[in-house]
Amino acid sequence: MGAKIRFPGEDNLNKGSYQDFGDIWLDFSAMGITDDNVQNYRRELNLQTGIASTEFSYKNVSYKREHFVSSPDQVMVTNLSASEKGKLNFSAKMELNNDNLEGKLTFDVRNQTCTIEGKVKDNDLKFRTTMKLLLTGGEITADEKNQVYRIKNADQVTIIMAAETDYKNDYPTYRDKEKNLSNVIDTRINDSSKKSYDELKQTHIEDHQSLFDRVSLDLGEFQTSVPTDQLIDEYRNGSYSHYLETLAFQYGRYLTIAGSRGTLQATLSAYGQ
């Protein structure tokens, strides 16, 4: 027995979808780095800390990038570092590459920021996002014509990004007309910029672990040194790993913690992807 439910309105399955409203591009070609000439390349998502990282070596120097989204500070943070001082040379820019949106980009050289603001074309949902660069050592110059920052001989670079919309889960308009997106974003960027990278990182870890550490699952196998893609291949070929099953369970918990904190439900199906 089955039932077919028809909801009022046309195109009932089209409930909208999540939209990206800002791409950050990092170009390391100034250092001579390509996909083919780096060594010891490794990517990792640490479920225990909620931090994604990329590491590699080039000309006997080790480079590392760490990424996380901090719920307490409401910012996305990327930190770039090297094993030797003055070895970071790259360019950074932010672009709007989404045909469903319209917006404009402003370049604030004095504050070392880049901001995109605009709206969704079909429903006028407003958005704003700002990227700010913070350097330890080295220098930063601005190519205003191409709207790109160029970093030279830096020891460490921290990129802070904040984003917000005027969405409000309140029928029937689903808009917060009182929200000043500029004030919200500027406050987040300014407050986060006053903290060191280690402070931002520690705040994020403590917040993440306050939720993640509530549940543990032990199926009797631990293979943390085996790459995940290898575990998946072995599982598909009949070498069943209980550790992979544990990992999948905890990964689902991580996605919920990272993506849905009560402000908006997680995407649970193909619709809206």
Each model region followed by its residue ranges:
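Aromatic-residue-lined binding/catalytic grooves and analogous aromatic/hydrophobic interfacial grooves
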Residues: M1-Q273
